[in-house]
């Protein structure tokens, strides 16, 4: 009976997930993980919880209307990252660890894009200081992502609009050095 109960909780979480009821899926998965923390399928439960936290589904319709992760709720992305990180930390040899690691990389890039999109939003509304601050967050927290080059360019544009031409010139120099460094063999 215990084994059937375990399977029932886990399987109901999957059904909720496939039925686009992420909150119920997460609730069932939390219940499963609390009741059976050392269960052989705990890695799967964590992986499914991470996907449900992002409210992602695999399937034809969801792939056709898939929204960019960076346009979704930033807190949900951070929460999902933490779930995937727990999976990789607790179960590094799990069959789900490579997928969780890939999702973590996607989420870091999405967070960087989210910050950059916010900076662009402020720039378009001529809130140059706010745009500059958001672009600095990208450089500080996500400097190893492909988004950092765009953040530097936006910073240079902000400095120009603020008539801080020395800072703009410095930023353009950094961009040139960064670009040269990246393109050298």
What role is predicted for each listed range?
Residues 18-28, 34-35, 53-83, 122:
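Short coil/linker segments at helix-helix boundaries
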Residues 78-91, 159-179:
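TPR/TPR-like (Sel1-like) alpha-helical repeat modules
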Residues 1-5, 9, 181-185:
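Single conserved hydrophobic/aromatic residue that forms the stacking wall/gate
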